């Protein structure tokens, strides 16, 4: 046999021999299993981390909403703390206006008293205005059920229907919130 034939025969013998698993193959398989296990643990840890991150973001957003609501509640409490007190002052303002309206302005003896009542009324009006208590002036304005209380309706062809044509009692608002609606007469279309 020549050298070439010997090589071919040896190679055929090597190829024909069954390859038995060695310790190297079992080590590779064990390492692959360990890698797969670690990858699964990593994926589970990442999912848990994402869930915790989302939970933390929601908690922060909820805290911000709570803080904002608390600030709004405090602001409203400051703004409307005077509401009951202001409502109690309204009859005093009404009485001062009524006293001026009904006073005999021709009487010389009453002129100093009328001036005093007028000054008291102006002083009181400017004082309550500093705290946000302002009268509503609905005359010739469209009727607003949130700010007006209709006491009667009168036919009027000159004004649009549901227009305030007379104010029987002033309404007041405190910082934009109506604390007493104005009592008004409202126009209606002629029949």
From Swiss-Prot:
GO terms, molecular function: adenyl-nucleotide exchange factor activity; protein homodimerization activity; protein-folding chaperone binding; unfolded protein binding
Biological processes per GO annotation: protein folding
Biased composition (Basic and acidic residues): 1-10
GO cellular component, one term: cytosol
Pfam family, one: GrpE
InterPro entries: GrpE (IPR000740), GrpE_coiled_coil (IPR013805), GrpE_head (IPR009012)
CDD domains named among the record's database cross-references: GrpE
Major location category of this protein: cytoplasm
Subunit structure of this chain's protein: Homodimer.
NCBIfam families to which the protein is assigned, alphabetical: PRK14139.1 (NF010737), PRK14140.1 (NF010738), PRK14150.1 (NF010748)
General function of this protein: Participates actively in the response to hyperosmotic and heat shock by preventing the aggregation of stress-denatured proteins, in association with DnaK and GrpE. It is the nucleotide exchange factor for DnaK and may function as a thermosensor. Unfolded proteins bind initially to DnaJ; upon interaction with the DnaJ-bound protein, DnaK hydrolyzes its bound ATP, resulting in the formation of a stable complex. GrpE releases ADP from DnaK; ATP binding to DnaK triggers the release of the substrate protein, thus completing the reaction cycle.
UniProt name for this protein: Protein GrpE
Native source species: Aeromonas salmonicida (strain A449)
Taxonomic lineage from the root: Bacteria, Pseudomonadati, Pseudomonadota, Gammaproteobacteria, Aeromonadales
């Amino acid at each position: 046999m020549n050298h070439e034939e010997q090589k071919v025969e040896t190679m055929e013998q090597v190829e024909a021999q069954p390859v038995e698993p060695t310790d190297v193959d079992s080590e590779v398989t064990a390492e692959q299993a360990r890698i797969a296990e670690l990858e699964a643990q990593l994926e589970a840890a990442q999912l848990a981390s994402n869930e915790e991150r989302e939970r933390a973001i929601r908690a922060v957003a909820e805290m911000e909403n709570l803080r904002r609501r608390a600030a709004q509640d405090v602001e409203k409490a400051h703004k409307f703390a005077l509401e009951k007190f202001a409502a109690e002052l309204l009859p005093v303002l009404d009485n001062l206006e009524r006293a001026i309206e009904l006073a005999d302005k021709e009487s010389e003896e009453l002129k100093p008293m009328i001036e005093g009542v007028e000054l008291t009324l102006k002083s009181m009006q400017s004082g309550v205005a500093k705290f946000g208590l302002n009268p509503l002036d609905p005359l010739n304005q469209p009727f607003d059920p949130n700010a007006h209380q209709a006491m009667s309706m009168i036919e009027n062809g000159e004004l649009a229907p549901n227009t305030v044509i007379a104010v029987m009692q002033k309404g007041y608002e405190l910082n934009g919130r109506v604390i007493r609606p104005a009592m008004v007469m409202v126009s209606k279309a002629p029949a």
